[in-house]
Structure formats: C-alpha cells, structure tokens
Amino acid sequence: MCRRAPRSIPLRCAHAPRRDVYQEIPISSFADQTFTAPAQIRNFCIIAHIDHGKSTLADRMLGITGVVADRDMRAQYLDRMDIERERGITIKAQNVRLPWEVNGEKFVLHLIDTPGHVDFTYEVSRALEACEGAILLVDAAQGIEAQTLANLYLALDRDLAIIPVLNKIDLPAADPDRYAGELAHIIGCEPSDVLRVSGKTGAGVRELLDEVVRLVPPPTGDADAPARAMIFDSVYDIYRGVVTYVRVVDGKITPRERIAMMSTGATHELLEVGIVSPDPKPSAGLGVGEVGYLITGVKDVRQSKVGDTVTTARHGAKEALTGYREPRPMVYSGLYPVDGSDYPVLREALDKLQLNDAALTYEPETSVALGFGFRCGFLGLLHMEITRERLEREFNLDLISTAPNVVYRVEKDDGTEIVVTNPSDWPEGKVRTVYEPVVKTTVIAPSEFIGTIMELCQSRRGELGGMDYLSPERVELRYTMPLGEIIFDFFDSLKSRTRGYASLDYEEAGEQEADLVKVDILLQGEAVDAFSAIVHKDGASAYGNKMTTKLKELIPRQQFEVPVQAAVGSRIIARENIRAIRKDVLSKCYGGDITRKRKLLEKQKEGKKRMKTIGRVDVPQEAFVAALSTDAAGDKPKK
C-alpha cells in the first residue's frame, strides 16, 4: 500500500538546492586580500543633496562589481537604520570595498557613502578626509541644490578630484543638457565632461567606475613609517563593543598589537582588523591607503573619537594627522517622558544612543510643569527630530520636547559672563550685553521667487551677503542670519513661499550682539517654565500674543476666571482671559423674591473670588503637547 507523506514534511527533490546552505557562502574576490599596492587603490565618496539618488547609485555599484548577489540585493543596501530607509536619507557614513578591472588590470575601490543633510556636515567632512576623489552627483530633473554646493566646497577645500555626474537620466522630466551646463559653470569644466548615469537602471555606471580609476589619484603614504590611521566613523555593536572605521595613511595595522589614540593617549589591544565588502570580513591587517575597521572591545564610542589619529603603542608616530575637532551642539531642546516613571528608561536610552552618536549631548533637568527630563544638545533640527524618533521607536517611549533654542552668551552688569542653553537659566535683573550665534545661509531657488525669499529673510533679521545667478532661471542668495530665527519654522516658510523649489544650507559664522529678552507665560500670575522663550525685543509681543491665544483655546475652563499673560520681566505685554464656568445657582428659585436671588448670586461671587486667590490651574498634558508641538512645527522638514 502506498503511504502518503505527512503534510507537515515538505516534499523536496534530492537534487534541489537548499537556500540556507549556499546563502552563507560569502562572495569573495581579489579585493578581499588586504595590503594592496597603493597604486591599485582608489578612495572616493559620493556627495549629493538629499534624494538625488546617492544610495541607489551605491546599490548599483555593489551589484555591478559583484560584491552583493542579485538575490541579496535590497534598496538602500548601505543604509542600515530603519529611519534611514523610511525617510530615504543617509545619517551615518558607511564604507565598502569594491573590486574592479580596467583593461585586465585589477583595482580596489573604497566607496565611502556620506550623508547629504546640513545637520550631518561633520560626518561628510570626516568622510572626505579619507578620500582622494569625490563624485558630485546631481539630479538631472532638479539641478544643483544648496547642500550639494556646501559639500562641494568642503571637497574643494581638501583638493579632492571632482567627477561631475548627472543621475536619474531615465526620468521623463530629466533635462541633462541644461543641468550639465550649470554643473560645468560651477566646477569650471566642459559640459561634455559631465557623465550621465541612471542609478535605477544602471546605465553609465560601468563608465563611471572606469572614470573613478582614471581620474582619482592613488593614495600616498610611507609604508615603512610608524602607523598612522584616521578614524572617520565609529559605531556601537552590542556584541563586539565599538567598531572603529579607519583610513590608514602611513605604515600598517595588524591584529593583536596594542594601539594608542593620539588625542587621549588611551591604549587598547586590537582584537580584530578587517574590511567591509559590504559585510565585515576579518583580514590580516591594513596597509597604506586602505580603509577598514578595528575592534578593540572598548564599550564607549567617545574613546574612539572621529577625526582622531590611531598609531601603535610601541614606536608610534609623534605627530597626529590634522582635521580633528569636537562636534559642537547648535540647538538645544528639553526631552521629557509623558509618563514620569519612564525617566530611568529615557536615561538608559540616551546613554545607548550616545554610544553611536558622539555629537549628542545631554544633562538632567527638572521642570515644574513637566517633571524630570533631559536638556539635549543637537547639531540641528533634523538631528533633533531623528534622535527623538529613534528614542520613541527603539525604546517605546512617549516624549514631550520643548521648543528648540540656541546657545546665548550673556554678560551681566557686574562683568560676569554666563552661557544660557535654557530660558530658565536667563539671569534676572540687569543684563549688559547678549550675544547670539549667527549662521551664513545659502538659498538656491528659481529666480521668480527672489522677492518673496528676500522678504522672508529680512523679516528674520537677515543681512544680504550676495546674490549670484547660476543660470537665467536659478539664483543663489547668501544671507547672514541669527540661528535662533532659523530653527523654528524658517524651513517650512521658505518651502511654502517657493512652492517647495528652494533649498537651504547653513554653516556657523560666529556670534553677534543682539537685543534679546526672555518672555514668560504666566497662568494665574505664576510663570510656567516650559513655555518661556528667549526672543528678539521686536518679536516679543508677537510671541506673547501667539502663546496666550493658543493657551486660551487649549486650557480647559475652570470654576474661576484665569488670566493668561505674557510678561517681559515685570511688564505684561499680552493677556487673554479663560472665562469661568458658572453653575446656575438660580435653578431652584421658581419666581420668588429678587433679594433671595441676589443673595445666592452674591454668595457665588464670593466663592469665586476666594477660589481665584487660592485656586491652582492644572494644565493637562495634552495642552502642553499641543502648545509645544504646534510652536515647534518647523521641526519637521517637508518630505
């Protein structure tokens, strides 16, 4: 009798290949062997504005060079974080080692993928330090944007070989001839020198890799000198501790030797040295010009600072490589858990995030209104938003963030100086001078919007620094503006006034003296610290009116009348009243004597009066969230 196979056992031919067996065999190539001759190495990066197809082009390169099999390929292969993949942006710089042959000669290409957003300019500048060339990638349908220019200037400062490339030539809206002329005008080359590729279809990518080999110079360095390597990124791995990405400049680095960090003097034993192709692979070491990773078992990212120089502990180099600076926070905001019992979880979450993000700073603070929380420092608004989103998503936290503000330097009348990152630290009494940070902003937009952009920038206390036409249709405007005016909703206003066509970039430009005041919001005569803000004297009454009107709508009515006031020092500049709820005390009186009714009304009036003197206003959590989030609506860049 023929027995049927039980349903739970899948029937499979004996010769059918098992997916899980061959999936684990990594693709290997000649690029997996380290200590390649420097003449055969090319280190390059891709610089582009957000959404110009940088990660898609990197995906095509991984596929064409064969380091990722077609079946394992996924979109944005190098973007590891969920947020990066969802938003379509690159936050952490990644690197990958690619094999490539030109006319039978074998080359090793190191591609370093960089972020495009202004907040992560420091990540870009470090990645550029590890390269000799850069692909300047521009969307053939949109043209050059402000952040592309900013990153191009960073690359030119470092004398990198620039390869101009137009991407997305397969789009129906693409106009490669027009934008090739624009690119050529900026870089100073011929329009015919601009390569045309499509990251989506792969058209022109092989020719681009050939150009990288031809135009990017090989790395230079002394193989016999003491080892020197520059750290351009470090990430935290929960199993292995800190993984440090380096580019070797001189000498060689091999496993099991002791290394020293030149900025701190700390020494560690090297447990593993390897390359990324595109997954980490241990190797025998790294030679001149090579890019790879080091694992020392250290648990704190701050011990391997990006931009620092690694050397050997014995007979190490005497002089560090240049280019290291501490990333400085530009924007501060308070983060508070909605549920007060989540405070320890938030502390632990920030600790873990800081392992991966050296630019994030935080310190505990308390607010009368919001309870315990942290004052966090960020590189910019996108950095702040992404940090908050990661905290909420990866650690299941519900957070309230206070309106962002910048760092002010205040000189008091007695000559002492304090640094203010929080409105509640603003000194009471006489202030001699206040200094606020200023930034140089670059706005690129169609020339029809010049008038509306100038009007917006002037309303934000901007000073025009210059204006250039990139082409008859596109213009570049340069303004110097206070950072405090940009961090609220400047980006949103700019986008809405230019129908989304304008792009913005900014960089630090020191500080300037300013006439700033602290506006307090008073409920029932008591200041609520969460709503305080530092604003320019001319904009104080506008801020006061906006907040009092908003709170009048958000705070529920009480048994007594509640005044909502905005004050600068002891001077009230705006006021709204939340009307009292009145119980109908005359409902029991059917007709009857008027004096009886009057007596009841007088009694109610007395009660309300007494309530007003001793009553407290409880602001519900939802009102805080609504007031602060609508106030900081500019946090969210338009997608």
Curated annotation (Swiss-Prot):
GO terms for molecular function: GTP binding; GTPase activity; ribosome binding; translation elongation factor activity. It is found in: Cell membrane. One of its GO terms (cellular component) is plasma membrane. InterPro entries: EF-4 (IPR006297), EFG_III/V (IPR035647), EFG_V-like (IPR000640), EFTu-like_2 (IPR004161), G_TR_CS (IPR031157), LepA_C_sf (IPR038363), LepA_CTD (IPR013842), LepA_IV (IPR035654). Residues 39-220 form the tr-type G domain. GTP binds at D51, H52, G53, K54, S55, T56, N167, K168, I169, D170. Its EC number is 3.6.5.n1. Gene3D superfamilies: 3.30.70.240, Elongation factor 4, C-terminal domain, Elongation Factor G (Translational Gtpase), domain 3, P-loop containing nucleotide triphosphate hydrolases, Translation factors. It is a peripheral membrane protein. GO terms for biological process: positive regulation of translation. It catalyses: GTP + H2O = GDP + phosphate + H(+). Keywords: Cell membrane, GTP-binding, Hydrolase, Membrane, Nucleotide-binding, Protein biosynthesis. Pfam families: EFG_C (PF00679), GTP_EFTU (PF00009), GTP_EFTU_D2 (PF03144), LepA_C (PF06421). Belongs to the TRAFAC class translation factor GTPase superfamily. Classic translation factor GTPase family. LepA subfamily. Required for accurate and efficient protein synthesis under certain stress conditions. May act as a fidelity factor of the translation reaction, by catalyzing a one-codon backward translocation of tRNAs on improperly translocated ribosomes. Back-translocation proceeds from a post-translocation (POST) complex to a pre-translocation (PRE) complex, thus giving elongation factor G a second chance to translocate the tRNAs correctly. Binds to ribosomes in a GTP-dependent manner. NCBIfam families: lepA (TIGR01393), small_GTP (TIGR00231). This is Elongation factor 4. The gene is lepA.
